[in-house]
Amino acid sequence: MAPGVRSLPFDLFRPTWAEVDLEAMARNFEAIRARVGALPILAVVKADAYGHGAIEVARALETSGAEWLGVALPEEGVELRRSGLRASILLLGGFAPAQADLVLDHDLTAAVYRPDQLAALGAAAGRRGVQARVHLKIDSGIGRLGVPAPEAPEFAALLKAAEPRIIMTGAFSHLAVADNPAEGFTAVQIEAFRGAVEALRRKGLRPDLIHLANSAAIIDHPPAWLTLVRPGIILYGYPPSDLLSPFPVHPVLSLKTRIIYIKTIAPGTSLGYGRTWTATRLTRVASLPIGYDDGLPRLLGNRGHVLVRGRRAPIVGRISMDLTTVDVTEIPGAGLDDEVIVLGEAGGERLGADQMAAWADTIPWEILCRLGARVPRVYLSRTGRKIVSRFETALASLPRGTVE
């Protein structure tokens, strides 16, 4: 909450919100800790903690014992530092040379894989009289960022030349198909990465942290654990694949809304843009104040469901920017202001990001990450609830009588 902003009544916001259960996240973290033992854990909180809200999630994970936090961008690292986070922060995606000052000024550990990154970081460290810490990113086979494993010795020479302004404290890579235990390429990547690390050591570089294991590898590939692990999606309650061994995590985020309008339409009446759905009977239709700007994929139109009074209600017509319509004909008593579960559980039914992803031909990661910025996050913990909204400051500036 911004300085000087008072707590606002929850009903001042549109009745669409996400609940983030920080106790569930703590239990997921403990399940990972039980799996890997004393190994340090780098909790991945990039992309606004997969849509859950990076600041509050990072605070909870730091309290749970995460030694490291992983982000993609320097800007994400700066946000965490300025919010008081003290854990070590790794920039998994590296940085642009022009951001070298930002990296050092906020005590961030940068991934490096380009010579100009070393030059910029070394110059910035020299101006400050400090030592920059880096992790070398190695491409062991995923083919995106990173020094190709066979070229590690050549890059090692650049790292040695950059000492003492730059010290390599870690080396890491990323797995391409660890979510499929039958895929032999994971073993190929592990071997390639180990070979690259040995080549670094022969050049006189001895990083303390060697890491490769993502969520899938934590579950089913112990040879990839090495000296640190990097859980991502399992922190948020979703195993990366049904092909992996069972793992005791539970979804952290629920997405909820309320019915704001109900009407009965006659057979032959169409709904929404493009008239993609037409009633074939007398139908009760409920309108929900949630749309694709809030994160619902348009592909859910005429495919997906929500839960109303613990029962599935089909989405009818196209998802609009701000509105979604559902058929509640078969749900007796469904009425105005009823709570609607978009993601979550009710009445023994569960709708998860995995189910929504299947309807939308995508993956749970995308469903979670696309949750809209205008959706308030309500953080639930033992100490109560905390509401975080992009509109908080604007609403708090209203005359006091308006918000009380």
Residue ranges and their predicted role:
Residues 1-26, 30, 34, 40, ...:
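Active-site anion/phosphate-binding pocket segments in diverse small-molecule metabolic enzymes
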